[in-house]
């Protein structure tokens, strides 16, 4: 029931961003008088054009935790350059024991990725990609590893500018 309440009470600002909830965990804090129950939420937010952010939120109630996570995700957005709905080149990322590999894919391939990575790609507007995760399947670490890999991606024009050459000289 709490998941449905989170959806109906979510007063998201109409800013055109796509939101996805990846995980909700029930957490407990043990105190002298017993246990205090709470909830932790992991969400991703994107504009469908290369901007994406992740957020975590904790609260005593599920809707409040999700709302906090969405707000944090909006504050922590990064821009990733896309090429025809996919990446420019293969990228690797890691966080903790989670390692991810992403490769660009031709048009019509779709999103071939598992779990939390798929949610990140959907909100940021990637339509064709092949991704694989190794090691930890913890959603928090997988999302952070995915974000790390996306931050490592560059364009040919970026590399050409760093080298002081033209894009044709880089490829030629």
Swiss-Prot record:
Pfam families: Ribosomal_S5, Ribosomal_S5_C. GO terms for biological process: translation. Disulfide bonds: none annotated. It comes from the Bacteria. Residues 17-80 form the S5 DRBM domain. One of its GO terms (cellular component) is small ribosomal subunit. The keyword Transmembrane does not apply. Keywords: Ribonucleoprotein, Ribosomal protein, RNA-binding, rRNA-binding. One of its GO terms (molecular function) is rRNA binding. Belongs to the universal ribosomal protein uS5 family. The N-terminal domain interacts with the head of the 30S subunit; the C-terminal domain interacts with the body and contacts protein S4. The interaction surface between S4 and S5 is involved in control of translational fidelity. Part of the 30S ribosomal subunit. Contacts proteins S4 and S8. With S4 and S12 plays an important role in translational accuracy. This is Small ribosomal subunit protein uS5. It comes from Polaromonas naphthalenivorans (strain CJ2). The gene is rpsE.
């Amino acid at each position: 029931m709490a998941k449905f309440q989170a959806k109906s009470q979510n007063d998201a600002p109409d800013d055109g961003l796509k939101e996805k909830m990846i995980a909700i965990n029930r957490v407990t804090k043990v105190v002298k008088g017993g246990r205090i129950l709470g909830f932790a939420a992991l969400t991703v937010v994107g504009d469908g054009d290369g901007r994406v952010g992740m957020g975590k939120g904790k609260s005593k109630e599920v809707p409040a935790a999700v709302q906090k996570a969405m707000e944090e995700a909006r504050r922590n957005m990064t821009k990733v350059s896309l090429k025809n709905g996919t990446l420019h080149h293969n990228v690797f990322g890691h966080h903790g024991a989670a390692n991810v590999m992403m490769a660009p894919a031709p048009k019509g391939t779709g999103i071939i990725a598992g779990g939390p990575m798929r949610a990140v790609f959907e909100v940021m507007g990637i339509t064709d990609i092949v991704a694989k995760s190794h090691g930890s399947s913890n959603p928090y670490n997988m999302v952070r590893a995915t974000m790390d890999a996306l931050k490592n991606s560059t364009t040919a024009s970026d590399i050409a500018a760093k080298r002081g050459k033209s894009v044709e000289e880089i490829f030629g």
